[in-house]
Structure formats: structure tokens, C-alpha cells
């Protein structure tokens, strides 16, 4: 996934507001990603990086990959549709782009729908807490920046997708409640 190509957190320059913009495309080592992708497509073995969210830096674990004949590469991550990731010499007909998002189809009543951003926030809060060692308060305080990043770096490229896949399920809020409720009730108002 593209998360493993994050640059070390201490090398990220703060934005005009003095805060780190972790949604910016420049947080991804696009040069290394393109280099590794070209080597994989050329049939070479590549040692893939791994990003430690606990340490805030890239680590090398010796995970090597070499494609078999007729293999498919799946690039997963927020910036996967951004054209800057693809080397110019990759033929467009060899690339199939899929935009995956939780497009929740639920309404509170006849006039008020549940915004898709709510489900994304709930998902991210649980993910950050369980897999990135991030307190709930940190995720909540970053949400405005995340949404700015979506508007600037994600949504403009969804039109590049060949297909859009809705990853939400009708019962998801009921399932996620078990995980999110204890986290949110522990947050100080």
C-alpha cells in the first residue's frame, strides 16, 4: 500500500498554519514508489518499505517482491488515483483505476441523510486507534485537515477512476458501534 511509502514524519514540512498536512501528496515518497514500480514491471525483485506509524518513519523488514508472469499490481491508498504516481512510460491501457469509498445510503428521516463523511470519520477513528497507536482525540482534532486534504488531493482524482466501488454496507453502523462507542464515550467534552 501507499502508506508504506510515507516519508519519515520528521522530514515533513509544516504548512502555513504550522501544522503537518499529512494528507498532502508530498508526504508520499513518489520518486521511490515510481522507481519500485518500474523495477517490478521490468521483472526485477524489489525490497518494499514498511512505514511504522508508532515510530513515524520508514523501516525495512526485508520484504521482497518479484512479479510472476501475468501478475497484477494493486496499488492501494488515498493517493492511488493521483497521476503523479505513474511513470510516464506506462501505457494507459495497462492501468485499471478503481475508486473505493464508503458511500453510506442511509437517511435519518425523509429530509436528513447521514453524510458519508461521518462514516469515514468513524472508520478512521477506529483504524487509527487500533492500528496506528493514535488516541481518539488526535484523530478528531485532525479531521478538519483530513477533509481539506480530501477536497484537494482525493476528490479531484476520483473522476480518473474507471469504476467506483461503494464499500459501505447497510449494517455497518451497527457493527462499528461496538468499536467506536467506548472510544467516543471516553473522550472529554
Model-assigned labels for residue ranges:
Residues 84-189:
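Conserved NTP phosphate-binding and transfer environment spanning the P-loop NTPase/kinase superfamily
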Residues 1-4:
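Phosphate-binding active sites in nucleotide-utilizing proteins
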